[in-house]
Curated annotation (Swiss-Prot):
Main location: membrane
Membrane spanning stretches: 61-81
Localization per Swiss-Prot or TrEMBL: Cellular thylakoid membrane
Organism of derivation: Synechocystis sp. (strain ATCC 27184 / PCC 6803 / Kazusa)
Cleavable signal peptide: none
UniProt keyword terms in alphabetical order: Coiled coil, Membrane, Thylakoid, Transmembrane, Transmembrane helix
Name of the protein this chain belongs to: Thylakoid membrane protein ssr2422
Sections of the chain in a coiled coil: 3-34
Superkingdom: Bacteria
Amino acid sequence: MTNNDNIRLEQISEDLEAQRHSLNEQGQRLDRIETILTNLVTEIKIYDSKLDTYQKASQQIVNIAFGLLATSALAIIIPAVLNR
């Protein structure tokens, strides 16, 4: 093996080491991104649950309001009709 071959092999070895280091850093970044996304998915599920509860409660309030309106209307109409 010539001196130039040794230099070339050393250069290739250094390049491979740099790429390995870069891949490790990218892997760590991907792990951090995965953790962040997992946390976001968890938060979205919590907000989705809260929103679902809010929507159900709102619908119940609307139903109660219409029930009260119907009851009060009947409370006025029935005595008026029966007294005639």
